[in-house]
Amino acid sequence: KIWTSSAHRADHIMVLTRTDPDAPKHRGISFLLCDMNTPGLTVNPIINMAGDHGFNMVTFDNVRVPKKNLVGEQNRGWYVGATLLDFERSGVDYSAGGRRVLEELTDYAKNNNQNGSLISDNPIMRNRLANLAIEVEVSRLISYNIAWMQGEGLVPNKESSMGKVVGTELQQHLSETGMQMLGLHGQLEPGSKYAPLEGRIEHMHLTNVSETIQAGTSEIQRNIIATRGLGLPRG
């Protein structure tokens, strides 16, 4: 299993395994919890472009998991995993982090010059910041709706996909705008005394590449919104 988030910190890992080889497609799969200390299980780190260790490759070599670790019904693990993804994709943190970065970029634009004038006077940058403010607010409202649904015991599905698309693309739009605003200095890493905003934008720009891929790509999320949200036929 590759690209496993935080496997180096976890004490258990979720496993979807086929328990009925004759069942079609999504059926015949069971959901198990496997202790990370189980013999035969190995975790190898994957370091991203920013130098962070968040992902891992987990290898299973003749690993045995007891029946008591079955979650839900046998052969219906796919549906447990799908519900789990709905919660993982909810992304209620995107708007909060996005608002902080937007405030930092706005403050930087108000107090720094580019080509002899304040960045905040540049119509292109003003337009970008205004669009980001709209995206942050949309992400916040979607997050609040998802949080309300979860509080009511409901499972957000298309709503989580909407939240993930808006939230993850917001992160990329923020870092792209930040890199353009900061210019060449925006490429400086955290720790450099010349790095604007302590190098956070450069770090964010490198880590955000995976945001629209992990937990289901933006293309997958849009398909979910189209089919389950709008009732459109599968392509």
Residue spans of the language-model regions?
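A short core secondary-structure module
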Residues: K1-N44
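Glycine-rich phosphate/pyrophosphate-binding beta-alpha loops
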Residues: I2-A7, M49-A50, S210-A215
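Tryptophan-centric aromatic hotspots in well-structured domains and transmembrane helices
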Residues: W3, H12-M14, F31, F55-T59, ...
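Short, well-ordered loop/turn and helix-capping segments at boundaries between secondary-structure elements
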Residues: T19-P21, D35, P39, V65-P66, ...
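Glycine-rich beta->alpha junctions and the first turn(s) of the following alpha-helix
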Residues: D35, L41-V138, E211, T227
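A structural signal for short secondary-structure junctions
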Residues: G51-D52, V101, Q172, G199, ...
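Glycine-rich phosphate/cofactor-binding loops in nucleotide/flavin-utilizing enzymes
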Residues: N75, Y79-F87, G91-S95, L182-G235
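C-terminal helix-coil-helix/basic helical segment that borders enzyme active sites and/or dimer interfaces
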Residues: K110-R126, E137-K193
